[in-house]
Amino acid sequence: MRADAARKREQVVAAAGDELADLAVAARNGEPIRLSLDKVAARARVGVATLYRHFPTREALLEAVYHQELTRLCDAAPELAASAPADEALLAWMYRYLDFVDSKRAMGLDLRAMVASGAITQANTRARLTTAVAPFLEAGVAAGVFRSDVPPDDVVAAMAGAVFAADPTQQRDQSQRLLALLIDGLRA
């Protein structure tokens, strides 16, 4: 792919991610949501034809956004783990996880279709999140802040539970409180 084409592709993915973040806010306010490819193209400052050249379907674009945002979330973990005490760093990263989940809600039925088709797998997502959580736990155990008997996979399962068990009318606030409880439960 030529450099200019790769740059435009990245612009489209970034614009779609930003649009989904805006839609997640709208969804929390009860507004109807649906990703508009015209709005994504305008936000990316490319023509609709350019968008479709790189992403022939809405699902292809959303899959690229999903993978990019998951990579960004997971890649941020080691640096964040090294930048603050383990409990504070892990909670800050968990809040980023909430942002990731919020933007996925805006994908709605499209995300369900991608999971059903196998384009996105829960196993891969969970494995990547588990790998990302490990540095926080290792740093916390080494500092005497966290218990040593909790595997990263259990933390990921509890994070998902906190998000999906929260009352829809207070989704973000309750999820944040549940994640703070999870941090308290990890303490030595």
Q: How would you describe each model-predicted region?
A:
Residues 131, 135-143, 161, 165-188:
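C-terminal peripheral helix-coil segments that are non-catalytic and often amphipathic
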Residues 64, 77-103, 121:
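Hydrophobic alpha-helical connector segments
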Residues 1-43, 60:
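Basic, helix-initiating cap at the start of DNA-binding domains
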